[in-house]
Design a protein with these regions (language model features):
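Short small/polar-residue motifs
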Residues: 139, 203-204, 211, 320-322
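Extended basic-aromatic, gly/pro-enriched interface segments that bind polyanionic ligands
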Residues: 2-16, 21-24, 54-59, 64-68, ...
Length: 364
């Protein structure tokens, strides 16, 4: 006897809800090049793909940058053709998707390296003063120079002092390998072994490069290694990069939470929990450290006419972070009508790398 399919009458299909996975790595690197066709973009994933797409005969400069990038472990690179450094506008940079954090530009054969450096530096300065650029949409621009005398402090501007074309792509390659969801992947860029030529500098010139917050490769412990590790404003490169990624992953996690239609105090507990869980990943990755104390004055914030203390002077960040969620009572009726959550403040103790060891002692 033939069986009748019961789905004709009652069709049930219960599935587990699958939350979209959030990646701990980003497709972070954009490389503009004056070579090629304006408007053409290619996401390149390997040196083999780079060499087949950008042959040295047609793209003699672009391939140099890509070789340096992939020879130093770069993960992916989005190449945007037909734009030189002088053609890139602030709007071009701001229009890039948030995941693209690192931006470089190929030197035109007719350009002086100082001109390219100056153009990218101007872009970085302009971006740093743009109030619409913060948190998840910040970019770090990478450039190369052969002049060590620039003392200007510039936010989110990473500089490699080198005579080798494309050497700044070692910075991009290093950052592209960081995975904030894996253990101990966030480390100081200084002393990283790299596959480029070492610079032959006097001790005085080397000191000037570091004093001006540039990066330079030298031979150290029988290998070519980057020294420096800072952005042009003196902030640590790795920490600045991971802070941007933290903004992005936290935003993604909290957005996923919002679509679940959370409400009231239980919703605030969920928000707190999501933030804490995310920060624990960053602690495991090495970005957050446990040995810092808030030595500044009390951090007070004002909201709707009331003052709240986020963290007091002398507080040890024993977990590596402090999360302060203002109470429901801080909300006005207008806030409640707009379905706002109270403001949330996060204080994070980021790691720092030890770059110099000084030992003082006496022989007795």
């Amino acid at each position: 006897m033939a069986e009748i399919n019961l789905k004709r009458f009652v069709d049930i299909d219960i599935q587990s809800k699958v939350t979209r996975a959030i990646s701990g790595t980003r497709n972070i690197v954009v490389l503009y090049t004056p070579e090629g066709t304006s408007g053409t973009t290619n996401i390149i994933s390997s040196l083999t793909e780079a060499e087949s797409t950008y042959s040295s005969s047609k793209y003699p400069e672009t391939i140099k940058y890509l070789k340096t990038y992939f020879n130093n472990g770069g993960v992916k690179c989005n190449v945007i053709e037909g734009k030189s450094s002088k053609d890139i506008s602030v709007d071009d940079i701001k229009a890039l998707p948030n995941e693209y954090i690192i931006v470089g530009c190929v030197k035109d054969t007719n350009d002086e390296i100082d001109a390219v450096y100056s153009n990218l530096k101007t872009l970085a300065i302009t971006l740093s003063t743009d109030s619409s650029v913060y948190g998840i949409n910040e970019k770090i621009l990478v450039a190369r120079t052969v002049t060590n005398s620039d003392e200007t402090a510039v936010k989110n501007f990473a500089v490699k002092y080198s005579n080798e074309v494309g050497a700044e792509m070692t910075i991009a390659a290093y950052l592209s390998q960081i995975n904030v969801y894996k253990q101990d992947t966030v480390k100081d860029y200084s002393f990283t072994q790299e596959t480029i030529s070492a610079e032959n500098l006097s001790d005085a010139d080397f000191g000037t490069v570091l004093d001006n917050n540039m990066n330079v490769d030298i031979t150290l412990v029988d290998a070519v290694r980057n020294t420096g590790g800072n952005l042009k404003d003196g902030s640590e490169l790795t920490n600045a990069f991971v802070k941007i990624v933290l903004h992005q992953t936290l935003t993604e996690k909290l957005t996923q939470l919002l679509v679940q239609k959370i409400k009231n105090s239980s919703g605030l507990s969920q928000i707190y929990s999501i933030i804490a869980q995310e920060l624990e990943f960053y602690k495991s990755a090495g970005y957050i450290t446990l040995d810092k104390v808030w030595n500044s004055s009390d951090l007070d914030v004002s909201y709707n006419g009331e003052t709240y203390t986020v963290i007091q002077q002398g507080t040890a960040l024993i977990n590596g972070y402090v999360i302060k969620v203002l109470p429901i009572s801080s909300l006005t009726e207008a806030d409640k009508s707009a379905h706002k959550a109270p403001p949330i403040y996060v204080v994070v103790a980021d790691q720092y790398g030890i770059r110099q060891i000084t030992i003082n002692g006496e022989v007795i």
